[in-house]
Amino acid sequence: MAHGAEMHMGKWPAPEVESAGYHEQAQLMQQAGVDAIFVEMVWEWSSHGKLAVAAAASAGIPVAVCLAVFDKETCQQECPCLSDGTFVEEVARELASGGRFQNVEAIMIHHTKLPLTHACLRAIRRGGWTGPLGCYPDHGTFVMPCWVYDELQGEHFVGEVSQWVEESNCTLVGGCCGIGPETIKGLSCWCCKHNGKSVQ
């Protein structure tokens, strides 16, 4: 259930229409027997992201909320914000409070540049979220009409992941756009060793 990134600069429907659309999609997925709903690309919270997450949570199945953070300055200041100015810590606090978000089982940071991830994960924990925490960043830059990637050393990525785990008890890790199979292979080996399993 992707949350309208393509509508970033366009016109949004009336809130009740937008909410009804999210609820309809959530119910259709629930009726189809999905095990969980991942609400991705939540780069805005106050007007739209909150509606999408509440609708997903109303379906009565586990929900993962996947926040995308682009603001380098606020991350460097240890107070990361979404694009609407909402602090990541505030979002975590609201999700941790239960209520209409009681079926939210995990919060993730995704589609976010690697150097920004640590501040975001720490902010989620500061917000009082004690449940599962995940991170799957992207890598590269979109230059019309396609993505451009520079090399990402697998060892560097694994080093970042180990810090997520140690500092923030991050238990769900992976990669988004631009994190290729070789990097994921190295991550898989690290995860097996970390979890005490033999590497195949």
Indicate residue ranges for each PLM-predicted region.
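Domain-level signal for soluble alpha/beta catalytic cores
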Residues: 1-200
